[in-house]
Amino acid sequence: MFYHLIAPLKNKTPPLTYFSKEQHQKGALVNIPLRNKTLLGVVLEEVSKPSFECLELEKTPYFLLPFQMELAIFIAQYYSANLSSVLSLFAPFKECDLVGLEKIEPILNILSQTQTNALKELQKHSASLLFGDTGSGKTEIYMHAIAQTLEQKKSALLLVPEIALTPQMQQRLKRVFKENLGLWHSKLSQNQKKQFLEKLYSQEIKLVVGTRSALFLPLKELGLIIVDEEHDFSYKSHQSPMYNARDLCLYLSHKFPIQVILGSATPSLNSYKRFKDKALVRLKGRYTPTQKNIIFEKTERFITPKLLEALQQVLDKNEQAIIFVPTRANFKTLLCQSCYKSVQCPFCSVNMSLHLKTNKLMCHYCHFSSPIPKICSACQSEVLVGKRIGTMQVLKELESLLEGAKIAILDKDHTSTQKKLHNILNDFNAQKTNILIGTQMISKGHDYAKVSLAVVLGIDNIIKSNSYRALEEGVSLLYQIAGRSARQISGQVFIQSTETDLLENFLEDYEDFLQYELQERCELYPPFSRLCLLEFKHKNEEKAQQLSLKASQTLSSCLEKGVTLSNFKAPIEKIASSYRYLILLRSKNPLSLIKSVHAFLKSAPSIPCSVNMDPVDIF
């Protein structure tokens, strides 16, 4: 008789002991009886016979691979998350007959000498940062690294931050790796996911391109992980467990013989500081030499005569333009011109956004919506106007001002399904549309030959925000959007901002900005300090505050040396009818932070809170 400690999946019950007539390996998936139900569980370890009576488990053909088990345990510990919830993120493996595919000989473009040198340098390190300018040929280096990995009979994973990147990236990779390639993201149907996993089990799929959840797939003999656009905040989960997929990849490179390459034209300050003295590979210049002219317009207006002239020139030459707008929908706020009050969500302490497509105001936090009011609820005035412009308003204005222009929008409202996303991108690629207006989705990795003009509107709303990363996020975004223009033909970048004197200093070389920001960034914030954010919420504001005060008192006796604590009302005070209070822990030593949080959670299990280790922002 054998006894095993089992973590029930999709259940917050702590690990339980079950018996079996045969021995099971760590990571095996088993069926277990629990509260009159049969659940899946994961074997954590074999244990001695307990003093109490145990129920019997039943084996299944599925199991988690060693790297998956190691990663799950690390996530639970580092992010202070429930192990059963973490294990539920992972897709298990199943042994089956291997598909006898004909060996694919990838037909790759020949690398330039600079690219060849960069690839050789990357291969010297288990983890490295490929800091390559937009258009410098990072993707070609990725493909050569992947081909070499597959040649060694190992599998490879290419992570991209958003689904919007995957169709175009997939097309380029499909031509080279054919049936060895599989695409994974959250919008696949259950049937599509099942078919995908069957091909993964048979090792028909050896290369996976996917968003952050692809890291939890059972890739047998995983030898290479590439994190494209590593700076992107989309790699950070905002639901428990609040992991960062990029950081998890670096952990795997430390624990297993898995090479990790982080790639970006605008690497995060954290990654730049981590790699700049040991494993940073710099790739300067463009693979295709083109000219790019940067035009600044110091204005708070959006659709100006100067911008219209630039767009008309693009249309006259039968070329294309992309326009970045920081807000989807029509306006960030609907503002009364008499009392200057905006329309706020009744359940959250944030302004609602105007969506003309559905004729509604919507809260982007709790998704509450309401009809557009005709009068101000505060003063009864009928003069309500938008404070900030959005994608739909830009579309409507340009359609009325640019005769014959074919304009489309790329934002979350217009890409609710994979089919809609494909249609928008395919139409733009086929030049069925001349102008593509988008939010941050438009900055991410798109490569279109006829784009000769990239327009940046409203960047001031980002660089003037309250975030400690505001300038980094804004300048990075400028570079990324500018990189969509003049990839194969000469072009222009048109930037509207009242901060032109500041931004002009950083548009020659992004590394200049990184070095500037390393000097200017306060030592209280990353990459110099590590942060952990604890959130306490309640429908009653006073009780939410009491929870945070009680937690502060308990934490004070749990803090490791060098950990500081600050307690405050959340900048967004209320979300989904719950009031929010935050405790921010800081330390230069991440282990001290983790120990402090673990001690607090153990000392005060009755105080409900969410733990966000390494938050990308404080809101």
Swiss-Prot record:
It is an enzyme of class 5 (isomerase). Zn(2+) 1 binds at C336, C339, C376, C379. One of its GO terms (molecular function) is zinc ion binding. Binds 2 zinc ions per subunit. Residues 119-285 form the Helicase ATP-binding domain. It comes from the Bacteria. Keywords: ATP-binding, DNA replication, DNA-binding, Helicase, Hydrolase, Isomerase, Metal-binding, Nucleotide-binding, Primosome, Virulence, Zinc. One of its GO terms (biological process) is DNA recombination. Pfam families: DEAD (PF00270), Helicase_C (PF00271), PriA_3primeBD (PF17764), PriA_C (PF18074), Zn_ribbon_PriA (PF18319). A motif (DEAH box) lies at residues 228-231. One of its GO terms (cellular component) is primosome complex. ATP binds at G132, D133, T134, G135, S136, G137, K138, T139. Disruption phenotype: No visible phenotype during growth in the lab. Unable to colonize the stomach of C57BL/6 mice after 4 and 8 weeks of infection. Bacteria are able to invade gastric epithelial or macrophage cells but do not survive as well as wild-type cells after 24 hours. Cells are more sensitive to DNA-damaging UV light and DNA gyrase inhibitor ciprofloxacin. Cells are very sensitive to H(2)O(2) and slightly more sensitive to growth at pH 4.0. The keyword Methyltransferase does not apply. Its EC number is 5.6.2.4. Residues 371-532 form the Helicase C-terminal domain. It catalyses: Couples ATP hydrolysis with the unwinding of duplex DNA by translocating in the 3'-5' direction; ATP + H2O = ADP + phosphate + H(+). InterPro entries: DEAD/DEAH_box_helicase_dom, Helicase_ATP-bd, Helicase_C-like, P-loop_NTPase, PriA, PriA_3primeBD, PriA_3primeBD_sf, PriA_C. Its cofactor is Zn(2+). Zn(2+) 2 binds at C345, C348, C363, C366. Initiates the restart of stalled replication forks, which reloads the replicative helicase on sites other than the origin of replication. Recognizes and binds to abandoned replication forks and remodels them to uncover a helicase loading site. Promotes assembly of the primosome at these replication forks. Important for survival of the bacteria in host cells. Belongs to the helicase family. PriA subfamily. Component of the replication restart primosome. This is Replication restart protein PriA. The lineage of its organism: Bacteria, Pseudomonadati, Campylobacterota, Epsilonproteobacteria, Campylobacterales. The gene is priA.
